[in-house]
Amino acid sequence: MSGLRAASVFSPVFKRMASSIPSQFKSIIYNSHSLEDCTGVLSVHNYKPKQDLNKSVVLRTLAFPINPSDINQLQGVYPSLPEKTLDYSTEKPSAIAGNEGLFEVVSLPEHGDHGELKVGDWVIPVQANQGTWSNYRVFDKASDLIKVNGLDLYSAATVSVNGCTAYQLVNNYVDWNADGNEWLIQNAGTSGVSKFVTQIAKARGVKTLSVIRDRDNFEEVAEVLEQKFGATKVISESQNNDKDFGKKELPKVLGDKARVRLALNSVGGKSSSAIARKLERDALMLTYGGMSKQPVTIPTSLHIFKGLTSKGYWVTENNKRDPTDKVNTIKGFIDLYKQGKIISPEEEIETMEWDANNGDDQQLLELVKRGITEKGKKKMVLLKW
């Protein structure tokens, strides 16, 4: 599947695609939550869609990642949850799991506004909570979808969360001067979002100081982040928390007239206060995660004497409040990708294949459960059609 992209439109192929839409769809659903074992609330459900498919946008699923937010929803602890409904012909009100996925348009309404959509286009939903762990999905309007043609499968399937988050963090809060020696600092430098941040920032002429956990192969990991993903400099958490390093070594790293204008925090605890200390006066720290499960701690002096602003960022709420910004974000991301300034996250992802034509329900359920519970790389379910 490496390098797979949206296909061109060949009428015989897509007529065949539209005619092959099954009478029943298959989705992974839940009607309750469990903090102890969230996989136990899942089941595979086959149902006849209630929408008139001749008047709807019909999509078949190409891939969906399994994200931490998906797991938190199953646990019932995520602030944004889909509405449970009887629309899927279930005994109890249920929701389809999954917030993110890549789809292919297989049928468009016979009449009405299709926007820019064509059969064969690759698309993602504008909003979260649409239910992506399914073989087919139906949308009422073309405007509920964003075209992602031009991206490879791995980028397209993950752009709605990691890609959007990184792009908006870099571009929406600071008016950067690309001609100046301007920096952002971030912790969790090996995360998927952080890797996109360094690439997007580099494309804007912004330098990045990425903080990563101490480890035996620190130099090897730092080199990959700098050479492959465009981080300007990688430092360890020990260095991040070392005040002597901050006073003596960091100025050498940053160079003359350096301005550290933005901190991106997804860890919390001591790491968050340490990156905040490196900011210039009247700078901003954005918190978009809390991997350490420790509170964000900011020294009082930074607020009083340096005018630091600290605020939260949540991609789901941002895009709900301003869906047009999400559309523009995706377009901007695709432009950078086409220019070769963003690389595919393919190597960061472990794919799990769902035989959409021949696989049985129990195999599918076990596949998804394994994707939720196994450690290691980010998991993505890839549908084999």
UniProtKB/Swiss-Prot annotation:
Binding site for NADP(+): 162, 190-193, 213-215, 288-291, 313-315, 378
GO terms of molecular function: DNA-binding transcription factor activity; enoyl-[acyl-carrier-protein] reductase (NADPH) activity; sequence-specific DNA binding
Keyword Cytoplasm: no
EC number from the UniProt entry: 1.3.1.104
GO biological process: fatty acid biosynthetic process
Keyword entries, A-Z: Fatty acid biosynthesis, Fatty acid metabolism, Lipid biosynthesis, Lipid metabolism, Mitochondrion, NADP, Oxidoreductase, Transit peptide
Main EC class the enzyme belongs to: oxidoreductase
Location, primary (coarse class): mitochondrion
GO cellular component terms given for this protein: mitochondrial matrix
Subcellular location: Mitochondrion matrix
Catalytic activity as recorded in UniProt: a 2,3-saturated acyl-[ACP] + NADP(+) = a (2E)-enoyl-[ACP] + NADPH + H(+)
Coiled coil regions, renumbered to chain: none
CDD domains per UniProt: ETR
Active site annotation, chain numbering: 78 (proton donor)
Entry function: Catalyzes the NADPH-dependent reduction of trans-2-enoyl thioesters in mitochondrial fatty acid synthesis (fatty acid synthesis type II). Fatty acid chain elongation in mitochondria uses acyl carrier protein (ACP) as an acyl group carrier, but the enzyme accepts both ACP and CoA thioesters as substrates in vitro. Required for respiration and the maintenance of the mitochondrial compartment.
Assembly behavior: Homodimer.
Family to which the UniProt record says this protein belongs: Belongs to the zinc-containing alcohol dehydrogenase family. Quinone oxidoreductase subfamily.
Protein name: Enoyl-[acyl-carrier-protein] reductase, mitochondrial
Name of the coding gene: ETR1
